[in-house]
UniProtKB/Swiss-Prot annotation:
Lipidation (S-farnesyl cysteine): C662
Region of interest (Linker 2), residue spans: 215-238
This protein's encoding gene: lmna
Other observations noted: There are at least five different lamins in Xenopus: the somatic lamins L(I)/lmnb1.S, L(II)/lmnb2.L, and A/lmna.L; the oocyte germinal vesicle lamin L(III)/lmnb3.L; and the male germ cells lamin l(IV).
Alphabetical UniProt keywords: Acetylation, Coiled coil, Intermediate filament, Lipoprotein, Methylation, Nucleus, Phosphoprotein, Prenylation
Domain LTD positions: 425-542
Protein name: Lamin-A
Pfam families named among the record's database cross-references: Filament, LTD
Region (Coil 1B): 77-214
Segments for region (Linker 1): 67-76
Length: 665
């Protein structure tokens, strides 16, 4: 007939178990085996007591001695067992209290993260508003600069108009002077005309006088001439006089006509010049009036722009003051957040110390159980009791604790999850950029890789390469086309052919030769130039969290195993600010009473090693791993940091060997 422990062992062989559950089941099986052996031992003791009772009638003295010894051992054992039970109860209560406090701390951490996210969003909103106001200020500055330029242009036009007005006024003065000269010449011409008329009248009078004188002379001659020739002579004289008169009248008419034409032409020219000068003066006056009106409007606009500029400057000063106040407030909030994070880390360190105390208590109980096992083995050998087959198998098995085991993603997916065990994973990213182009985004499923030009200049990507390294696998390399250029501030996405994207250069490129960029726990994507110089890098590391609960014995204890492989070039993980180191313990050898050296204890290996049945003590080495999963980002939580604890378990007997023969010294 199988015991309950053997049934549970048989059932557990058909279900894949996690290492932590296996360890707990093994510990439970050990305790069950010890209880079975204790029951056998108690039965044997009872049979011996019955035999001793029958023998007590014959040997009273021996019975008294044996009864006293058995009574003392039994009372001591019951006392120690009661103390152990009380210790276990107190440990369970303390553990429940610690779990409640841990859940409360987690809630507080979530609230702090939410408050921090809200404050960061408010800060981003304020920064965006500041950028908008700066853009508005820049536009107003540009408008002011444009207005000032227009003002300078208008002032130049005003100066040019003033110079033109001065020229027109000078031309008007010249025209007036010419008009006065023309009027003077007209008066002079009229005077000359009057003089010529008077001369003509004088010449007429002289001519008439000469005619009369000539007539008298002819009359005198006619008297002397013959009567026959008198009539002919008079006719000839009349013709000559008539011809002379006609010639004089023609000359006088021509002279009058020429003088009138000259006078009329000069007078017409003077009138046209005066009219032209008058029109120019009117136009100049109109232009001067329009220029004055325009100058007044521009002066009003300039004063208005100056008022707007003063208002903008005042508003800018107010915005700068508000931004300074907001920045100081944000700094205070960040300082409060850092202080709260420091307090939280201190509380977590305190909780970790208390948890370490609980671990120490648990290890002490394990040592007592081991001593109890040794005591039972010694009693079984002394009483020649045969241990059960399960006990022999468990005594031949070595329980080794694992530290920092690297569990691959594919193996974790293939492993079936047990009841009460949940698992979650997330990616941690690390990026580095030394050039103009950065690795903006990497798809964890291997669909695409996105690059961004962070500078204000275009960058040629001809013959550049993207190198993808997944764990220890062979890297894959994508080479850009020779003439590809990435514009300033733009992005380019290189899609795998299996993603279903369309080729649309220069923003979207499809790698037809590769169906996927690949996936894994550690993904490193690097951008190389044509000379194989690395200018940008982004690394993704998967973080796996396993939560395991044991519902069979109503134990709510959680074990978190974090597989967090995060590689930095030239950086040691021991400098992680989120790492918590447990306190060291000094182990004393039960044989010689001296403290053990760490190097000797470490050389004995990691795990729980059971000695032979005849040894007086055994060595226990237990490795626990704690490390902050927050990394350098300031997050909280427990992660990997191997801490080894060594204990020496004795059976309560005094050592019979010399210190120089100690196995651990």
């Amino acid at each position: 007939m199988e015991t309950p422990g053997q049934k549970r062992a048989t059932r557990s062989t058909h279900t894949p178990l996690s290492p932590t559950r296996i360890t707990r089941l093994q510990e439970k099986e050990d305790l069950q085996g010890l209880n079975d052996r204790l029951a056998v031992y108690i039965d044997k003791v009872r049979s011996l007591e019955l035999e001793n009772a029958r023998l007590r009638l014959r040997i009273t003295e021996s019975e008294d001695v044996i009864s006293r010894e058995v009574t003392g051992i039994k009372s001591a054992y019951e006392t120690e067992l009661a103390d152990a039970r009380k210790t276990l109860d107190s440990v369970a209560k303390e553990r429940a209290r610690l779990q409640l406090e841990l859940s409360k701390i987690r809630e507080e951490h979530k609230e702090l993260k939410a408050r921090n996210a809200k404050k960061e969003s408010d800060l981003l909103t304020a920064q965006a508003r500041l950028k908008d106001l700066e853009a508005l200020l820049n536009s107003k500055d540009a408008a002011l600069t444009t207005a000032l330029g227009e003002k300078r242009n208008l002032e130049n036009e005003i100066r040019e108009l003033k110079a033109h007005i001065a020229k027109l006024e000078a031309s008007l003065a010249d025209t007036k002077k010419q008009l006065q000269d023309e009027m003077l010449r007209r008066v002079d011409t009229e005077n000359r005309n009057q003089t010529l008329k008077e001369e003509l009248e004088f010449q007429k009078s002289i001519y008439n006088e000469e005619m009369r004188e000539t007539k008298r002379r002819h009359e005198t001659r006619l008297v002397e001439v013959d009567n026959g020739r008198q009539r002919e002579f008079e006719s000839k004289l009349a013709d000559a006089l008539h011809e002379l008169r006609a010639q004089h009248e023609g000359q006088i008419g021509l002279y009058k006509e020429e003088l009138g034409k000259t006078y009329n032409a000069k007078l017409e020219n003077a009138k046209q010049s005066a009219e032209r000068n008058s029109s120019l003066v009117g136009e100049a006056q109109e232009e001067i009036q329009q220029s004055r009106i325009r100058i007044d409007s521009l002066s009003a606009q300039l004063s208005q722009l100056q008022k707007q500029l003063a208002a903008r400057e005042a508003k800018l000063r107010d915005l700068e003051d508000a931004y300074a106040r907001e920045r100081d407030s944000s700094r205070r909030l960040l300082a409060d957040k850092d202080r709260e994070m420091a307090e939280m880390r201190a509380r977590m360190q305190q909780q970790l110390d208390e948890y370490q105390e609980l671990l120490d208590i648990k290890l002490a109980l394990d040592m007592e159980i081991n001593a109890y096992r040794k005591l039972l083995e010694g009693e079984e050998e002394r009483l020649r009791l045969s241990p059960s087959p399960n006990t022999q198998k468990r005594s031949a098995r070595t329980i080794a604790s694992h530290s920092g085991a690297h569990i691959s993603s594919s193996a974790s997916k293939r492993r079936r999850l047990e009841e009460g065990e949940s698992r979650s994973s997330s990616f941690t990213q690390h990026a580095r950029t030394t050039g103009k182009v950065s690795v903006e985004e990497v798809d964890p499923e291997g669909k695409y890789v996105r690059l961004r030009n962070k500078s204000n200049e275009d960058q040629s990507l001809g013959n550049w390469q993207i190198k993808r390294q997944i764990g220890d696998e062979t890297p894959i390399v994508y080479k850009f086309p020779p003439r590809l250029t990435l514009k300033a501030g733009q992005t380019v996405t290189i899609w795998a052919s299996g993603a279903g994207a369309t080729n649309s250069p220069p923003s979207d490129l499809v790698w037809k030769a590769q169906s996927s960029w690949g996936t894994g726990d550690s993904i490193r994507t690097a951008l190389l130039t044509s000379s194989n110089e690395e200018v940008a890098m982004r690394k993704l590391v998967r973080t796996v969290v396993i939560n395991d609960e044991d519902d069979e014995d109503n134990d709510d204890m959680e074990h978190h195993h974090h597989h967090h492989h995060h590689h930095h070039d030239g950086q040691n993980s021991s400098g992680d600010p989120g790492e918590y180191n447990l306190r060291s313990r000094t182990i004393v050898c039960t044989s010689c009473g001296r403290p053990a050296e760490k190097s000797v204890l470490a050389s004995q290996g990691s795990g729980l090693v059971t000695g032979s049945s005849g040894s007086s003590s055994s060595s226990v080495t237990l490795t626990r791993t704690y490390r902050s999963t927050g990394g350098t980002s300031g997050g909280s939580g427990l992660g990997e940091s191997p801490v080894t604890r060594n204990f020496i378990v004795g059976n309560g007997q005094r050592a019979q060997v010399a210190p120089q023969n100690c196995s651990i010294m």
